[in-house]
Amino acid sequence: MPCFSSNQLAEWTGGNWSAQPRGDINGFATDSRTLSPGQAFVALKTDRRDGHNFLGDALAGGAPAAIVSAARADVALPQLRVDDPLRALQTIGREHRRASGAHVVGITGSAGKTSTKNLLALLLGGPPGVIATGGNLNNFIGVPLTLARIEPGSTRFAVVEAGISERGEMRGLAGMIMPDSGVVTLVGPAHLEQLGSIDAIAGEKADLLRHVPSSGVVAFPHQAWTHEPFRDLAAHAIVALPADASAPADSERTRFVPFFLEHGDTHTEILLTGHAGARSFRMRRVSGGMGQNAALAILIASELGVCDEAIRTRLGDWQPAALRGEVRTVAGRLVYLDCYNANPASMRDAIEAFNALATSRAPAGAARLFVLGCMEELGPDSPRYHRELGRWLRLGTADRAIAIGSQAEALAAGLAESGKGSVTVAQDVEEVRDTVISFAGPVFVKGSRRYRLETLFPVEAGVAAH
């Protein structure tokens, strides 16, 4: 467990202690309700709440100290007064990472970064020698909290996820992470409302990899190579090359590794080819996009010294996180749940995976139900993206689709243009809950988190996950 001295924290942050901490500080928390023993409370101030109002709760919760911008004499909790608690937390995370000696892998992407982060952490050996971002704590608060968990002398690898929604954010995150290696899973339309264009997204994602030293390695898919910021990284890049693509003629400085995916009923085979010969790996069945991300994780793990035998063993232990490509059997029918987030690329990838599963597991011609929550933060082109998705889906005669949310009409219009099934428009899940629950065939559920689509199929006893 890491240990932070009061002198060290004061030096890093430029702060002053009201009194010495009540015990050892081994980490930090920004929510007084979730404090663990030894965690100092960071009193953040936001538009919705002021952490200084919860110093008493932090004291009652056993916090050894707090980091504040305005000390409160009425709370008998040692307080480190700084100009800005958030900036202080970020400085602590950065300086602790700098001194740690751990190999830090940074991961970002328009889709799949959390699942890839979890998989890579597993391939590198998992706890206690490997730490990874918890959940999706990938922002200016979550990243330093993750870095502060590195235990010098014990943590060999830290796999840190970086998520952005506005221009310039990646530079700040990468400056804290200081990645020794880096992975970008995908460049695609996500957070366009703030980022403005795919080119801007590519530049932001590549910014994480620019912070990797020349002695390190970066990995990304062939799709990202089409964007100039990624071609600028050619000298130390590994590019995953799908079976239907070929390496560009001007890529002699870059290592392109062809990969092939073969999907069975329950498993996906990943074949990597190259100068070292063919290498095959097996994992539970995943989508094509996740298969590509697995190839990237395998390539990075190999570069970091993990042998193929260990990778194969650990791949066998992997399973998707809840609501991220999760396959369940509910009342005898196939249910595909991918409700954490949605953008055009991840939508198509998940639908393709569901259709393949439904074809192999359901009777021929069985009706399918697509519950489609809208994709948020796509900017002024949002109606077009939704209409294009609907047009691409091509419902069968017996199929049904439910479009939920702000762009439901545009999505429904696209579905009507290309498909033959029936389409329902709704604003929230409660309008269609009975319809979904009573549907007898395979069900696909995906959309942005704000629509709470996961509430249609809460986890219950007797529900099987695959």
Please report, for each region that a protein language model flagged, where it lies by residue.
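N-terminal leader/targeting and accessory segments in enzymes
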Residues: M1-T91, E95, R391-W392, G396-A410
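Phosphate-binding loop of NTP-binding sites
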Residues: Q8-A10, A88-H222, T226-A234, F439, ...
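Active-site beta-alpha connecting loops in nucleotide-dependent enzymes
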Residues: D47-R49, A321-L323, Y340-K420, H466
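Acidic, Mg2+-coordinating active-site environments of NTP-dependent enzymes
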Residues: R72-A76, S181-L334, T359, A366, ...
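Short acidic-hydrophobic, aromatic-tinged amphipathic segments that line or gate anion-handling sites
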Residues: L80-D84, S422-V432
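ATP-dependent carboxylate/acyl-activation modules
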Residues: I107, A322-E326, R450, E454-T455
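Peripheral docking tails and interdomain loops at the edges
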Residues: G441-G462
